[in-house]
Amino acid sequence: MHATSSDDFSLSSRVALVTGAGRGIGRGIALALARAGADVAVADLDPQVAEETAAAIRSLGRRSLALGVDVSDGDSVRAMVERVATEFGRLDVAVNNAGVISIRKVAELSLADWDRVMNVNARGVFLCCQAELPLMQAQRWGRIVNLSSIAGKVGLPDLAHYCASKFAVIGFSNALAKEVARDGLTVNALCPGIVGTGMWRGEDGLSGRWRQAGESEAQSWERHQASLLPQGEAQTVEDMGQLVVYLACAPHVTGQAIAVDGGFSL
C-alpha cells in the first residue's frame, strides 16, 4: 500500500490559472495552489483586486501575474490565456471560478438578468476551457476544475437562473472529461455549499435577502447554517482550496461533480 506524503500533493513546477480570484472562493483557491508550490496567474474582472491576490501569492515565494478578464468575452479570455503562456510557458491547472448571482423569482426575472448569469457562469466556463485546452493537450497534462455549486445539484427558490447556469457547468464538465480523457487531462466540477463570502453574507447576500421578520442578517446567517447543513456550520474558502489542490494532483479523478457542502445536498 502506498503511504501518502506531502509530496503527493506538491504542485512544484506547475502553473495554475484561477479566474474570479480577486476575492472569496477564487482567492482562497489561488492561495491554496500557491502554498502547494504552484506559480499562479490571477484573473478577475477587477484588475486591482487581482493584483492584491497576486501580491499575497508573491509573499509566499511563488510567481504570480494579475490579469483583468471578462470571462463572457471570447477575445478577453483568449488574451488572458495567451498572456499566461507568454509569461510562464505552460498551463497545468485551470480553475474556472468567475461567477455572478442575482436573486429573483422567475416571474420577476428579466431577460437581462438571465443572460448576465448564464453568460458569466456557463458561457464563461466554456470559453475558458476552449482557450485552455490547446496548451494542456500539447503537453499532454492538465487539470481543469470548473466551479459549479450546490445550486448545480439542488434547485433553490429565487435562484432558478443561477441553478440553470450551475447545472450546465456540471453537464459540460462531465462531457468534456470524456472528450479529453485520453489526452492526459482531467476535468471536474467543484460544488461549494454555504460559504461566508459575498454571495451569502451582507444585506445583499442570501442571508440578508432571506431574513425572517425581525431577524438581523447575522441571525439569518446562523439560522441558515443550522437549518440547511447537517454539520451545522458553514464551509470556508480554505475547504475549497484543499479540494482543488487534491484534484490538481489526482490522476484518475475525472468527470465528477464534488460537493463540499457540509451535507447540504444529501
Predicted segments with their positions:
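Active-site Tyr-X3-Lys motif and surrounding loop/helix of classical short-chain dehydrogenase/reductase
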Residues: 79-86, 104-108, 112-119
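C-terminal substrate-recognition "lid" of short-chain dehydrogenase/reductases
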Residues: 126, 141, 233-260
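Active-site helix of classical SDR
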Residues: 129, 165, 173
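Residue(s) in the substrate-gating loop at a strand-loop-helix junction
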Residues: 149
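Short, small/polar-rich loop/turn modules that mediate ligand/substrate recognition or access, typified
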Residues: 181, 186, 253-255
